[in-house]
Amino acid sequence: MDEARKLKIAAAAEALTYVKDGMRLGIGTGSTAEEFVRLLAEKVKGGFRVIGVPTSERTAKLCEELGVALTTLEETPHLDLTIDGADEVDGELSLIKGGGGALLREKIVAAASDSMIVIADQSKVVETLGRFPLPIEVNRFGLGATIRAIEAAAVKCGLAGPLNLRLKDGSPFLTDGGHYIVDASFGRIPDPKTLSDALFAIPGVVEHGLFIELARAAIIAGTDGIRTMNRS
């Protein structure tokens, strides 16, 4: 097993200690979240009772294969806890998420939860967000106009950089909701809240990967052990 996976498993195992019998869980998307699902499934086999809302079809499939009971936000609109990964996390626990393409559902599930705990390895911790391209989920209609509006909004925030339509097998990547994703390489984002507000003002933007004031804690695994970051 490579070192990166060991760290993901270590963070997932620590997060599992926050999960109590009978909880309603939001279950994230991505490689670290999948390690959490595998560990959770082992506890479920031993009689541990939880019910989860998956943030993607991929996560739902893994939960079903491993025997983790699932529900929906229609049936269970209020969740106790969401466990999810992140592409970047800063000292204020602002996040960039969406590298796996599930940012809309991830944000809906996180917002429906009493708290959100992020699991990641040390490489995801940054001083300022923006090293990882910011995923922006957009409506397929009017793509060119939406990209132009994103560029203009970024300039007003003092940002600029390439906007690339995400592709998969040579065709535009489609989210579970049927939308496109534009990956924005703005570089450092010193004021995530201002950028967030500017993006939400664009009609063609469905959601973006800035998660602000959603995470309560981040469990970070490094070669020197586990540490927990808490939002001030």
Curated annotation (Swiss-Prot):
The active site is at E106 (proton acceptor). Its EC number is 5.3.1.6. InterPro entries: NagB/RpiA_transferase-like (IPR037171), Ribose-5P_isomerase (IPR050262), Ribose5P_isomerase_typA_subgr (IPR020672), Ribose5P_isomerase_type_A (IPR004788). GO terms for biological process: pentose-phosphate shunt, non-oxidative branch. It is an enzyme of class 5 (isomerase). GO terms for molecular function: ribose-5-phosphate isomerase activity. Pfam families: Rib_5-P_isom_A. Keywords: Isomerase. Coiled coil: none annotated. Substrate binds at T29, G30, S31, T32, D84, G85, A86, D87, K97, G98, G99, G100, K124. The keyword Magnesium does not apply. It catalyses: aldehydo-D-ribose 5-phosphate = D-ribulose 5-phosphate. Pathway: Carbohydrate degradation; pentose phosphate pathway; D-ribose 5-phosphate from D-ribulose 5-phosphate (non-oxidative stage): step 1/1. Catalyzes the reversible conversion of ribose-5-phosphate to ribulose 5-phosphate. Belongs to the ribose 5-phosphate isomerase family. Homodimer. This is Ribose-5-phosphate isomerase A. It comes from Brucella melitensis biotype 1 (strain ATCC 23456 / CCUG 17765 / NCTC 10094 / 16M).
